[in-house]
Amino acid sequence: MSISARYRQILETLEEQSDRFYERLPVEATKPLRLVDQAAEELQAQADAVGEIPQIQLESRLAPIIIRAHGKLDRARVALDDEGHERVAGQIWELEQLLYRLLNDL
């Protein structure tokens, strides 16, 4: 699967999971969930153009975006884990791993 296809697939998964997190968690957990939304927004900014980026520029153009999104997910995961929402924190960890693997493949 191409980098651009994986990027879009991760974004789609992140957006779907974010919606589910809002359904599962109490209203008090919305601040960490906002970080999940921000991570999706970071990725969404390049979603349309990702397939048009020349192979040689993929790392320099996508790495900063992926790193920022990963950082936001990490902060959300830690906050949710601290609040006792381990299951959702574990699911966010899985999303982080998808981004990490994509970053390594750039």
Regions found by a protein language model. Give the residues of each.
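Long, charged/polar, soluble alpha-helical segments
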Residues: 1-106
